[in-house]
Amino acid sequence: MGALISHNYKAYFGEVDYTPDPESMPSFDPNYGFQEPREERVMVATQKEMADARVPMQLRDYCAHKYMAWMMCRRDHMPNLWACKHERHEWDQCEYDDWVHRMKEWERERRLLKRKQLKKSLEGEEE
Amino acid sequence: MLELWGVLSLTSLGVMVIFLFSKIKSSFAESVKYAGYMNAVLLSILLMSDESEMLFLKWEWVKLGGYSLMISFRFDLYTCCFFVVGLYVTWNILMFSFYYMSTDPRIDLFCKYLGLFLIAMLLLVSAESLFQLLIGWEGVGIMSYLLISWWYARSDANTAALQAIFYNRVGDIGLLIMLMWSLVTLGDWSFTGLYALDFVNTFFLLGVVLAAAGKSAQLGLHPWLPAAMEGPTPVSSLLHSSTMVVAGVFLLIRFSPIILNHKEIQLMVFFLGTMTTLFSAICALAQNDMKKVVAFSTASQLGLMVTVVAGAGAPQLAFLHICMHAFFKAMLFMCSGGFIHGLQNEQDVRKMGGLHSAAPITSVCFFIGSAALMGVPFLAGFFSKDPIIEIININNLNSWAVGLVLIATSFTAAYSVRLLYFSVGGVSRMLVLQPMNEEYGNLIGPLQRLAYSSVIAGVVFIYFLSPNQISCLSLPLSLKLAAVFVTLVGGLIAWDVVNLLHREESVTNIPELAFEAQVGFYPLIMHKLIPKVWLNMGEMYQMQVMDRGWTELALPQGLGGNYKIMADNVVNAQTSLIKMYIAVMVMMGGLILGIMICL
Amino acid sequence: MAAVGRLGSAAIRSFLWRRTALLSSVRCLSKDEMPGPYPRTPEEWAAAAKKYGMRVEDYQPYPDDGTGYGDYPMLPEEGAESQDPWVDWDDNWHRRNYGDVPHVHSDAYTRQRVNPSQKYVVPWKKMIAALVGFLGFNGIMLYFGEMYKHMVPVAPKQYPFNNLYLEKGGDPDKAPEEEIKNYEFPKS
């Protein structure tokens, strides 16, 4: 909680100038600053698969295939759900990685905004 | 195969209904129990299958032009879980009421009322169309009225029952708005149809919010819930903690896909929920009536459920909290019922204390229930409350609302610890020679069953429910422990304050406590202000201007007088003088002639 | 609305029975028991006060705006509930003495019904201030909280297929303006 409070403080008081706005988040070119173009995120499950499996809307993300695998395992081993802890862990790990990805995106945006700020101030000094 | 299981479930419920008319009251409790078992089997079958929902019966009742009213039952995950929870809790409460109401001459009727309520509630949760929902909704409303005013000779109970039904009527306006709008605009009442149409309408959603606020005692329409504690304790336990009051949240859950598409309504429900949870928690802090504390904590938890339905957009968590809450809150009420019964109807916590030696099993159950309510790890409440706090913490939500939810959570611990300290712990302050005894099978049995379920229900439900939203996996440790932390803080503060206030040398009457003790002055102000405004308007416009003004002048009362004046004039003209008649004739002829000339 | 009432009252007074608006509910009363017209002159005023057994200084009829009660005195709103129960009243149940002028709404202020002069532990204004203050403070703070949202340092969740354009009910015939693509970070 302390981390969030300090983050909130930074977002509204300490680092207002270069805190990203989550509403308009990727404001920079995705490849800006990278040596070689980034790879696109791979979506394994297709739209039809997800629709057939009736995956909840919030879970139709890049981990949907693991979720579907887990659900299939649950269905096959229904009374004994411990049998699916491997699949459950796979899905959890994928969601965790997705969360880390989101954090990375945020940090990239923040650093780029800060850099932009710095550049602007340097230009102002030169003039 | 699945249909067969569904038919079996409905049959068991039908048998339960038949047993409602049996002369032996315990056979009805048995039938509720076996119906519960049967439906637990149905739930597991449903979970094993690939189906996420089933519709039964599909009987066309009324056909009006292009519209047909179908009667069918919707068996999805929510319905099945609620069937099991509701039947289990009802069975235990029926057994408990055999103990609690054993001296009541009309106990058979009481059990029948509870059974009728149960049927209405099951109709409500298994409803497939808004019309069936209305039947169940009004059914639980009227049973609530009858059961609160069970001791009808007490004017308090009558007042409370009237309050309950009036506040519920305000909420029912919302339900009627929903019904009318959907019939006129969409021509469809079935949930399947409403989901498929994927509409977003402010009017309809305001109806949903109003209905839910009325039934679930959200801020503004909440005073009936603490007042309803005038009813017998089994009623408070069944209706006003575990089943009936969650009907509003259930409605919100049913319509959550539509609500989440409308930003303003979503925000409104979120604020309503957070304010309710804080306000009720504050009110619970300074109550001295044992049942009222539990009632306000119920209202607070209902606010938390509403918050998480709309704010975080996780209806499944709200439903999980409904189920967990049903177990431990029903048990808390039953424990307080046991205490109250043992102390000869003494509800004031200041006259309790030291009950851990007088009633050890009840005290232990009370402790487990309070701990589960606080969200102590690995009890039932933890598995629903902790994800709720987490999911509120990791979304970009209104910061003040997030703070309010955390404060209310810490208050939950505060009033629970206070209640425990006063009733179970400490020194005995009760009158001497109280025949405190808990050696009744019908008290201990239900309490123990619900205590076991309060411990393991969380694990079982988490085990079986497949998640509908992403669980929070990568929180910082401090945030992960936030729920536990605020609970701990609340408990410690309560301990400190209780020690501060209730020593002999301390000042016990702090004027600032009046706001909490008088439940925020809300019922006082609202129950005086609004009737007074209407009364004055009625006196002014209806009584003085209409009844004693224009009605006297021109309308029925005035007609007599006016005709009397006219008749007097006519009588005065009847003088029997021929000259007079001729004069009148000439005048009239002249008048007619003049008019004709003018035209 | 008062104007309409005044018109009706004036009409009644001028060309009907020359009585005030107090008519229908006391139709059974005799003419002497009815309240008289609104006192205009000081003499009428004094006579009315004497009729009701009051001092002239205390006597104050309802304002004659068409919805008044003639010369009936405007008494303080006191419910029977808040009268002293230990006084030796002539009528112990209604807590009033013989000859007391009842309030014009005294039928509503009996002991089973409302009590307008209820004494509260906390003064009325303080109570309203506390409730309105609580709700208003929270309302204002919720408004500010909406401006300063709780900020979690993560980007919004990325979804495939144009941010689930079709799944969220997008028009399949009309493609979205720009295709949203999400990229991995290079593995280090």
Curated annotation (Swiss-Prot), chain B:
UniProt catalytic activity: a ubiquinone + NADH + 5 H(+)(in) = a ubiquinol + NAD(+) + 4 H(+)(out)
GO biological process, one term: ATP synthesis coupled electron transport
GO MF terms held by the record: NADH dehydrogenase (ubiquinone) activity
Protein name: NADH-ubiquinone oxidoreductase chain 5
Protein family according to the UniProt entry: Belongs to the complex I subunit 5 family.
Coiled coil: none
InterPro entries xrefs: NADH_DH_su5_C, ND/Mrp_TM, NU5C-like, Proton_antipo_N
GO annotation, cellular component aspect: mitochondrial inner membrane; respiratory chain complex I
Subcellular location, principal: mitochondrion
Keywords recorded for this protein, A-Z: Electron transport, Membrane, Mitochondrion, Mitochondrion inner membrane, NAD, Respiratory chain, Translocase, Transmembrane, Transmembrane helix, Transport, Ubiquinone
Protein role: Core subunit of the mitochondrial membrane respiratory chain NADH dehydrogenase (Complex I) that is believed to belong to the minimal assembly required for catalysis. Complex I functions in the transfer of electrons from NADH to the respiratory chain. The immediate electron acceptor for the enzyme is believed to be ubiquinone.
Cell compartment(s), UniProt: Mitochondrion inner membrane
Membrane-spanning ranges: 1-21, 28-48, 81-101, 115-135, 171-191, 193-213, 233-253, 265-285, 302-322, 323-343, 363-383, 398-420, 455-475, 481-501, 510-530, 577-597
Protein encoded by which gene: ND5
The protein's Enzyme Commission number: 7.1.1.2
Membrane-protein topology: Multi-pass membrane protein
Taxonomy, superkingdom: Eukaryota
